[in-house]
């Protein structure tokens, strides 16, 4: 199986038709719509969040054929469709949002080309293995299998999932005392920097995330109403969180190098699912929510009070026996 002449000539096009007008166009293909509604709002945010798009086309044997690119204002149009002129046959499409932008934080391990196969496709976070203190550019993934018949353009939708997370950690003293972020070292560790074609993670060695921003903020008054509360915060940007990975959040007190907390991060995030989103699977929940906020409460000696935390504005009671 081959692509029509125009695709065989063009290795990187935003659409098949409209270029090489002297060549006979295909008479069939697909028109693809792209949707990102795999989120907690269940609303399509593709046009507001995806600023560049790459669509890889493979034949039914998994042989690479061509890459299509979409960029700029065309993606903001809710009527945007990507038109592909294809010969009759079965195809596998893999879409990446945010991968081909100038500010991308991810790239292909090897750029797909003629002779490459789908099973070898790999996407890796930049500077994997080094401490990451970057606000990662959002990355999205989607895939679709479909067939093309003679003389028809099939309409289809590629549904995307977001692979990047923003995690905000807040330290607050229970009695309302000031907490200074400079007194603590915040880290997240995981192994989540290398993606397979199906968006699953491939072990790539440990990854350390440091905050891309941190500081102090006054958030209100104490329960008595007589004092403002100054908290410390640290904000992380990470790759995909996967249930079963040994993802950990550690906070160390710099004065004596003692660990204030060392917790299995994903399990703590899933405490919120248990209480409020129990109908969702663990991985569905982690993939649907991409903006996290966790508040930990400290005593006067800056030790963690292990009774409850606040996750995304919900109070979650802690039972250590469950973790």
Regions found by a protein language model. Name each.
Residues 53-108, 180-275, 323:
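Tryptophan-paired
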Residues 12-15:
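C-terminal motif of bacterial Sec signal peptides marking the signal peptidase cleavage site
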Residues 127-226:
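A sequence/structural signal for flexible, mid-protein segments enriched
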Residues 118-162, 263-323:
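Extracellular beta-sheet/turn segments enriched in Thr/Pro/Gly and aliphatic residues
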Residues 1-3:
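Bacterial N-terminal signal peptides that target proteins for export
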Residues 18-111, 273-323:
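Acidic/polar, low-complexity intrinsically disordered N-terminal segments immediately downstream
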Residues 67-162:
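Short, low-hydrophobicity acidic/polar segments
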């Amino acid at each position: 199986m081959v692509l029509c002449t125009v695709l065989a000539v063009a290795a990187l096009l935003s659409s098949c038709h409209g270029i090489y007008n002297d060549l006979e166009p295909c008479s069939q293909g697909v028109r693809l719509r792209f949707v990102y509604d795999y989120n907690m709002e269940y609303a399509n945010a593709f046009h507001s969040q995806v600023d560049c798009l790459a669509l890889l086309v493979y034949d039914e044997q998994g042989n690479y054929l061509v890459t299509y690119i979409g960029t700029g204002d065309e993606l903001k149009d809710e009527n945007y469709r990507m038109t592909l002129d294809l010969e009759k046959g079965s195809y596998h499409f893999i879409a990446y949002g945010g991968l081909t932008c100038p500010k991308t934080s991810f790239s292909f391990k090897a750029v797909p080309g003629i002779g490459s196969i789908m099973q070898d496709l790999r996407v890796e976070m930049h500077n994997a293995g080094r401490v990451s203190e970057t606000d990662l550019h959002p990355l999205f993934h989607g895939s679709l299998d479909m067939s093309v018949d003679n003389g028809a353009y099939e309409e289809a939708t590629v549904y995307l999932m977001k692979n990047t997370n923003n995690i905000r950690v807040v330290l607050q003293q229970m009695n309302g005392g000031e907490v200074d972020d400079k007194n603590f070292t915040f880290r997240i560790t995981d192994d989540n920097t290398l993606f397979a074609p199906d968006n699953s993670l491939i072990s790539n060695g440990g990854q350390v995330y440091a905050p891309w921003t941190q500081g102090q903020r006054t958030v209100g008054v104490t329960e008595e109403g007589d004092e403002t509360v100054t908290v410390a915060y640290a904000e992380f940007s990470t790759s995909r969180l996967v249930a079963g990975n040994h993802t950990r959040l550690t906070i160390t007190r710099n004065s004596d190098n003692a660990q204030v907390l060392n917790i299995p991060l994903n399990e703590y995030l899933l405490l919120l699912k248990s209480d409020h989103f129990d109908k969702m699977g663990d991985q569905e929940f982690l993939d649907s929510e991409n903006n996290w906020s966790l508040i930990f409460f400290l005593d006067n000696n800056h030790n963690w009070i292990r009774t409850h935390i606040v996750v995304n504005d919900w109070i979650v009671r802690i039972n250590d026996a469950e973790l």
